[in-house]
Amino acid sequence: MKFSKVSLLAASASVALSAPVAVTVTQHVHQAATVVVQGIVRVENGQTLTTFITKGTQTASASPVATTSAPIVVANAQVDSIATSVIQESAVVAESATFEESSTETSEAFSTATATIQAVQTSASATQDDVTTTLTSSTQPTSTTTPTTTTTSPTTTTSPTTTASPTTTASPTTATTTQSTASSTQSSSSDFSTSMVNEHNTKRALHKDTGSLTWSDTLATYAQNYADSYDCSGNLVHSGGPYGENLALGYGTTGSVDAWYNEITSYDYSNPGFSESAGHFTQVVWKGTSEVGCGLKSCGGEWGDYIICSYKAAGNVIGEFADNVMPLA
């Protein structure tokens, strides 16, 4: 084993007065056996003595070392560097002048340790390769394709959802169509109710002390049910219900209100009372009426739209015309 004389002399000088001996055991793990090299550095009679003792059975074939050797550590830092160089360098012990002066025990220990250290150093390069290979091999599970396969599985699993989509899509489509139709119907109904109540209030506003009407869904439902039952024959027959009522055919929506109101020309304010020729007009402007609701049926062709409006409270009450049919403002 080759040592630097300068290093050895420096170590010898520095540890001459060193405190108690520090012992480090370096263990080399092989596949078939374990060899333990024990290095002891001590100061005796002013001389620095180093003893190496091999424990365990030495294996002839150099097997890959699983772990790297730890350096021999002693109390003095300079001796530590010497011990490290002993592990790292391989040569004949006799070449070291310093160790020639050591005791026979030391020389024998070096001779015994040399073969062991050479075997360890011979396998050092293989150890590094094996360690690298082992690390690479142990790292492989991290990059294994199993997670990728697992990740792909959910994608495949979602396929039934995609397959089910047409059914789900068809349902919203139907729902959307239904909603659109309902929305359109509601919008049309809203437009109809707004236009009808506004047209009534426009006419009522022309008369003194005559308030506006409000739309009643209850009256509108009653009127619409009766309109739906109309046979579009051209004959107009009153429903006979509890509300005041005006009917029209072929005038359109607001056109019906206009036609009813135009009967004002037949009303005699000087002789207030009911008249067949002015009955629709008096119901439209009846002061005591506060609610209105109308129904519509399209007969098409010759007759056009059938309109029915129901009123609450009912107008045309005998004996109350003077108080409820107010003159123009």
From Swiss-Prot:
Lineage top rank: taxon: Eukaryota
Post-translational modification summary for this protein: O-glycosylated.
Ranges of residues in domain SCP: 197-311
Pfam families per UniProt: CAP (PF00188)
Gene Ontology biological-process annotations: fatty acid transport; sexual reproduction; sterol transport
Signal sequence region: 1-18
Main subcellular location of this protein, as a coarse class: secreted
Keywords of the record: Glycoprotein, Lipid transport, Lipid-binding, Secreted, Signal, Transport
Record's compositionally biased regions (Low complexity): 132-190
Localization: Secreted
Segments of this protein annotated with the region Disordered: 122-197
A GO MF term: sterol binding
GO (cellular component) term, any one: endoplasmic reticulum
Polar residues composition bias: residue spans: 122-131
Family affiliation: Belongs to the CRISP family.
Its job: Secreted protein required for efficient export of lipids such as acetylated sterols. Acts in detoxification of hydrophobic compounds.
Domain notes: The SCP domain is necessary and sufficient for lipid export and sterol-binding.
UniProt-recorded name of the protein: Protein PRY2
